[in-house]
């Protein structure tokens, strides 16, 4: 039977498996890419605030 244009096709078990695998890969990338990048950005902000607000040394 022909597939109508407006109707989405039914998801097969193979499609479901591929989608599940893609979601796992996305979760893995979050822990390996996003979190370290976020940590570096936060560290840079902390260092900048520390340098900007430290008292000037008078000698």
From Swiss-Prot:
Cellular compartments annotated: Membrane
Keywords associated with the record = Coiled coil, Membrane, Transmembrane, Transmembrane helix
Instruction: Give the superkingdom in one word.
Output: Eukaryota
Q: Where is this region: Disordered?
A: 1-27
A GO cellular-component term linked to this record: membrane
Q: Which residues cross the membrane?
A: 32-52
Coiled-coil portions:
9-31
* Repressor in keyword set: no
Q: Does the keyword Transmembrane helix apply?
A: yes
Q: How does it sit in the membrane?
A: Single-pass membrane protein
Residue ranges under compositional bias (Basic and acidic residues)? 9-27
Recorded family membership? Belongs to the SMCO4 family.
What is this protein identified as? Single-pass membrane and coiled-coil domain-containing protein 4
Organism whose genome encodes this protein: Bos taurus (Bovine)
Its lineage opens with: Eukaryota, Metazoa, Chordata, Craniata, Vertebrata
Name the gene that codes for it.
Answer: SMCO4
